[in-house]
């Protein structure tokens, strides 16, 4: 597998498409709540622990296979992860948890040029998720790709706050943490989102790793704190960006887009859920 990527708009040549096998709601703890359920009470989420319904996993796998087939027919090389049992419990001296899922390869692997960074997730349940991509990454190394991993975070309970989830992220700034989609890649410019999945220590670590390689890392704060930037800012080509008008305004729009043409769209609308409690 060869990696050479600099942005979000170049023609696609290779891709990793995830799988839904063994997907579940993991052990519900402060990291799980911070990652995905910040605006839900824990007593609503806790009973959902366990594997997702079979119909949901089957439908998700059918959709993912359909996507893989479409991409393959378009001449794109598609890689798939190996199934791993997310029900297996693992631990550190401070906590224990089960795993979560393997349908979001883009969350934990950040490609920059021919470098792939394994990112330090804010969620305990995702600390060993990249095992599913090990064979793909070994193939990439054999083809000359440089693979590095950020320091594994300790993720203590005190690393999260839920007293003011509207005013600031639930993730605190105790150690380097970020997901790959906290980063918007614009060639040598990278927009770094401060949110529930990325903090200032994560920003500093990435600056230390990438700035001597010629990259410029631009922090983006007070725009959207619930997770990733892909429902907020999407660069379409050089000089044209798609922006969520319910979050991005003329006042808080990142300066890197100051001279770009902008397309504004209304906020994303949830389509509902068949999961108990309406939890996505």
Task: Please name every model-derived segment.
Residues 1-280:
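The feature marks the mature, well-folded catalytic cores of soluble enzymes
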């Amino acid at each position: 597998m060869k990696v050479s990527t600099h942005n979000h708009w170049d023609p696609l040549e290779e891709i990793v498409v995830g799988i839904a096998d063994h997907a579940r709601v993991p052990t519900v703890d402060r990291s799980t709540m911070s990652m995905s359920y910040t605006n839900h009470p824990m007593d609503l989420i806790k009973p959902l622990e366990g594997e997702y319904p079979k119909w949901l996993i089957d439908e998700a796998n059918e959709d993912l296979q359909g996507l893989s087939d479409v991409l393959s027919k378009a001449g794109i090389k598609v890689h798939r992860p190996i199934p791993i049992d997310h029900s297996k419990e693992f631990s550190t001296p401070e906590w224990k948890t089960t795993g979560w899922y393997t349908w979001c390869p883009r969350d934990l692997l950040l490609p920059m040029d021919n470098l792939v960074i394994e990112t330090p997730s804010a969620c305990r349940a995702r600390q060993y998720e990249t095992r599913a991509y090990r064979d793909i990454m070994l193939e990439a190394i054999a083809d000359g790709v440089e693979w590095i991993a950020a320091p594994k975070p300790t993720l203590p309970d005190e690393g999260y706050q839920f007293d003011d989830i509207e005013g600031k992220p639930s993730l605190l700034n105790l150690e380097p943490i970020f997901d790959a989609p906290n980063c918007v890649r614009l060639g040598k410019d990278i927009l770094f989102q401060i949110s529930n999945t990325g903090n200032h220590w994560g920003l500093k670590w990435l600056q230390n790793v990438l700035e001597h390689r010629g990259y410029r890392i631009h922090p983006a704060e007070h725009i959207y704190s619930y997770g990733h930037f892909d429902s907020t800012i999407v660069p379409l080509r050089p000089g044209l960006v798609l922006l969520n008008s319910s979050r991005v305004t003329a006042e808080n729009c990142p300066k890197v887009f100051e001279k770009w043409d902008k397309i504004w769209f209304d906020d994303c609308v949830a389509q509902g859920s068949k999961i108990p409690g309406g939890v996505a």
